[in-house]
Amino acid sequence: MQSRFRSDRRLTVRMGVTLFLLGLLYVGFVAALIALLKSWVLVVVIVALVFGAQYWFSDRIALFAMRGRVVEREEYPELHGVVDRLAAMADMPKPVVAVSEMEMPNAFATGRNPDNAVVCVTTGLLRRLEPAELEGVLAHELSHVAHKDVAVITVASFLGVIAGLIVRFAFYSQLFGGRRDQNTLAVLAVVMGVSAAVYALSFLLIRALSRYRELAADRAAALLTGRPSALAAALTKVTGDIARIPTKDLRTAQAFNAFYFTPAFGSDPGLGRFFATHPSLEQRLDQLGRISTELGEAPAPGKA
């Protein structure tokens, strides 16, 4: 079903190109592993199991990792009301609503398609945001579901996960595997090298797509709600408050940066932007400012 979120051709093209390039990388990677390990059955079984688990259970994995739980309307009526209203406005299925008992203010969406999606917010976010700001954040997350970029990021991340697991396996095999002949050690070293290269390339491709999809979600949310200034206020508030959360608490969330409304850790300037999951706060606010002008949105009180 086509939602009322404005389609983004540039996002669609970028997702297609990213998946195509990752597909080529994936085919080459599997071929290299089969040639090196001389066991195509083992390689195919491992790849299929990891891919299946990541694709079909991505929502449960993310909720478990971030201590999220599905909540009913009776427990969070206002949250359900906002999601109901936005889903109706966007003409899309209502996702499952979840809450994570975390002080870090944030939100994320996960799931393999719009009919099997979850939107999760932290209690820290619910305590900090005004209703209009929360609506903007949830519209941002729903747009990820409608544009299907959540599923694309999940699938795209699969190659990096496989490569990372193989690097670790090869490393510990060398470390604790006892005496090995030179041929075995050489094969393990090559497997580690190939896997590390694949991980690095897939990492950069996914990060580039992730940064653009965040801008696309901001744009879609602002146009759906008609209140880009509320989303801008939420971005500013959440980014500032995250900076005050203890670092040890943020490290738990860092692995899921690509799925969050704002990253647990910001990127360093310069080359750091190529490794970032999100565009800078300035980029996001500039875009929302332009949309606000285009829509003729009235300035907030005290900002005229």
From Swiss-Prot:
Family, similarity comment: Belongs to the peptidase M48B family.
Transmembrane segments: 17-37, 39-59, 151-171, 186-206
EC number, as in UniProt: 3.4.24.-
Entry-linked Pfam families: Peptidase_M48
Annotated keywords: Cell membrane, Hydrolase, Membrane, Metal-binding, Metalloprotease, Protease, Transmembrane, Transmembrane helix, Zinc
This protein's name: Protease HtpX homolog 1
Domain of life (superkingdom): Bacteria
Tagged with keyword Transmembrane helix: yes
Membrane topology classification: Multi-pass membrane protein
GO cellular component labels: plasma membrane
Binding sites annotated in the UniProt record for Zn(2+): H140, H144, E214
